[in-house]
């Protein structure tokens, strides 16, 4: 008998937001139900909120479409942000020198699982 899959995941790779800033948003939704997590993200005034919301909605859609899971029974079991590639730029400074600018990118991962009743 095949084992029932009870979780689905979604990723957004190389998103142009610093991982440190994205982690502040991801920490708010970890362990919450999907409906509660979406409500939190909607009213969080951070640049990472729409990005994380899009990944969460994608994970829910993957769960419904690929594994026939009910969205009402889902919760955010894992949510984390890893560091992506860093774009290195330089800002001209006084006396012909330059200062480095690190434009950091993130890999956002959200895993939703079914609640075990």
Curated annotation (Swiss-Prot):
Superkingdom field: Bacteria
Claim: rRNA-binding is one of the keywords in the record: yes
Residues making up the signal peptide according to the UniProt record: none
PROSITE patterns recorded: RIBOSOMAL_L22
Single annotated GO MF: structural constituent of ribosome
GO terms under cellular component: cytosolic large ribosomal subunit
Biological process (GO), any one: translation
Pfam families named among the record's database cross-references: Ribosomal_L22 (PF00237)
Keyword set, alphabetical order: Ribonucleoprotein, Ribosomal protein, RNA-binding, rRNA-binding
KW Ribosomal protein (keyword) present: yes
Entry-linked SUPFAM superfamilies: Ribosomal protein L22 (SSF54843)
Subunit structure: Part of the 50S ribosomal subunit.
Annotated PANTHER family: CHLOROPLAST 50S RIBOSOMAL PROTEIN L22-RELATED, LARGE RIBOSOMAL SUBUNIT PROTEIN UL22M
Role according to the record: This protein binds specifically to 23S rRNA; its binding is stimulated by other ribosomal proteins, e.g. L4, L17, and L20. It is important during the early stages of 50S assembly. It makes multiple contacts with different domains of the 23S rRNA in the assembled 50S subunit and ribosome.
Family indicated by similarity: Belongs to the universal ribosomal protein uL22 family.
Protein name: Large ribosomal subunit protein uL22
Organism ancestry: Bacteria, Bacillati, Bacillota, Bacilli, Lactobacillales
């Amino acid at each position: 008998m095949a084992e029932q899959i009870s979780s689905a995941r979604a990723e957004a790779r190389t998103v142009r937001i610093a991982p440190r800033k994205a982690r502040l948003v991801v920490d708010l939704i970890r362990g919450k139900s999907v409906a509660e997590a979406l409500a939190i993200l909607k009213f969080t005034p951070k640049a990472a909120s729409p990005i994380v919301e899009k990944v969460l909605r994608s994970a829910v859609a993957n769960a419904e479409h690929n594994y026939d899971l009910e969205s009402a029974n889902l919760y955010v079991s894992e949510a984390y942000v890893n560091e992506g590639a860093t774009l290195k730029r330089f800002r001209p400074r006084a006396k012909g020198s330059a200062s480095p600018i690190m434009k950091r990118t993130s890999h956002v991962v959200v895993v939703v699982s079914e609640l075990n009743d």
